[in-house]
Amino acid sequence: MNIFYYDIAVSIPLRQCFTYKFDAKIKKGTRVAVPFGKRVLIGIIVRNIQKPNALDSKSTIKSILNIQDSETVFEKPLFDSILWASEYYQHPIGEVFNTFIPTELRKIDKKTIGPIGDHSEYKVKESDKKFKLTSDQEGAIKKLSKVKTFSPSLLYGVTGSGKTEVYLRLAEQCLKEGRSVLILVPEINLTPQLFSRFEDRFTGDIGLYHSRQTSVKRLKTWLKAKFGEIKIVIGTRSSVLMPLKNVGLIIIDEEHDQSFRQSEGFKFSARDLAIKRSQLENIPIVLGSATPSLQTLKLVREKKFTQVNILNRVDGRKPPKLITLDINNSPLTGGMALETIDAIEATIKKGNQVLVFINRRGFAPLFECGGCGWIADCHACDTNLVFHQSRDRLICHRCESAYKVTSNCPKCSSRDLHMHGAGTERVEEVLENTFIDTPIIRVDQDSTKKVGAMEAIVKKIHSSNSAILVGTQMLAKGHDFPKVTLSVILNADNGLVSPEINALEKLSQLLIQVSGRAGRNNNLAKVIIQTRYPDDINLNEIKSGDYLSFASQSLDKNFKMNHPPFSSICLLRCSSPTQKSNSIFLEKTIKILSNKAGVSAIGPLPSLISKSKGNYRHHVYIQATKKTFLNKVLKFLVIEFDKWPESKKVKWSFDIDPVDIN
């Protein structure tokens, strides 16, 4: 009897595969059940290997218990994408595989991979065939539809220019060629809107894939995609390696959005992984945005990406006018100046809608004692508690712990307790008391928790005449609110004073995106930006509305300072119950990095949120002139850490190309 040996990846936090044997040949990418200690785990065949040199009759190499499926989980391009991701992000390969396997297929049971038996036919619906394109849209479609192999394209389109229609036409062309399409969106709340547009355009089943669906529903979509029963899938970052049969096009909507970055567990960028996948599949990929990331614009400069522009709004509508409002000497009510409230009132009287943006949920972000200065903070995290009126609790936005509101200061027993600042709930309350007959619609993480909540809110917005929308970034992303003629931004200054390297990039994207919600059906729209820094050079440059000009200047500055995207960075993150353990581990790391050419390191530094869930958090900032240098150093560190007793006392991880230092 022949015995074959395999390296198998299992989902554990170790950067290695494990060798098992079996009496038959098994394809790479196949799911198998294997004994692991006292457990039985699902593993993925990574490679077939020769008989291990040290093998003897007393060998402890265990046997594979069972082949779970007759089909592989991942075909070669997706399999190779996972190998690349594990290598690039320096993350345990078993956990990377596990990230992209549906939950139901991670279980040891009788579920196997096979077709559902429900094929869809795709045609353009008659009602949608007469849609008239703008000349900009026609030009973009003509250029993009010519691309048939790997060649990343940036579709730059100002807000309201009709990028979604371009996506639809490109998808139609792809379907006519007998191929399938994957569309990635940054957030779950954007999937219903885009899903509706595709459903209105095409007959046939449109696949939807995101984390709020049941695991069974996600598995069904995954299987239908794998066996060619659906040819269009719209999903969030978890769908980036959706195994669509004969995929011919990947579209990334709002490519700049940081929600494409997973910040917990396996830290990866779905945008960058999608680009790698399209390279391995040798298919075109389109990245759409009104505010492209500096990383993407750098690649355009270097001729690695092609830029296609849509410079005018649909129907020739003018972009809204951005106005800064100096609030240094203005009393604020719920975070709003009197001039802001007057502008809201004038807009409502005309029968139009207003969008009020404040990137902070809850009622008040600070609960303070007037007697001794005590501030309510989380016992497990280094963060202030936020009062949520809807729950009558003080909430930690880091670990979501809830605390009762005390009537006496726990430090000095004073009853002189006050709430300061404003969140979405407080703004909502002030507006409800000011505009009694006007619907106030709050859109934040708390108001959209229930399944279908966002769809109901969007429906209410579209069915209302005069209304005031109050919300966080959820409102700023990709939504079409044609009745909004005034947008108000309450806390833009946070981006001007942030220590983050990419703070101004984030701020410019946010301001342009929020302003883009206004004036989609009206030439007289405006945006009010409340600020204590009305003369700030960067703010006034952003206010001009010329994002590409601002981004180009930012790239020039970053190039001179050797900041990303002109250098490669990694945060070595570290957490433990004691600051001393972090310090010993990271200082030892700094010492060995000091001898590495092409790499510099700063630290150890406390994270901006220095304590979370009972653990102290620190990091080392590692910067390299080239990605190859960085990758080489990180591989070296992994080997070293495995030898160190200090690494066993902390939880460490690499965050490559990080989007923040929180």
Please provide the spans of the model-predicted regions:
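Terminal, basic amphipathic appendages of nucleotide-handling enzymes
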Residues: 1-152, 322
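Short, low-order "capping/linker" segments at domain edges
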Residues: 58-61, 372-374, 611-623, 656-662
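Short beta-strand elements
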Residues: 440-441, 597-607, 648-656
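A short, contiguous, amphipathic alpha-helix enriched in charged residues
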Residues: 9, 15, 28, 581-594
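Inter-lobe coupling/hinge segments of SF2-like helicase ATPases
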Residues: 129, 134, 149-583, 591, ...
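Short amphipathic alpha-helices in soluble, non-transmembrane regions
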Residues: 585-591, 631-640
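Short, intrinsically disordered low-complexity segments
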Residues: 40, 50, 603-628
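Long, charged, helix-prone linker segments
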Residues: 102-108, 653-661
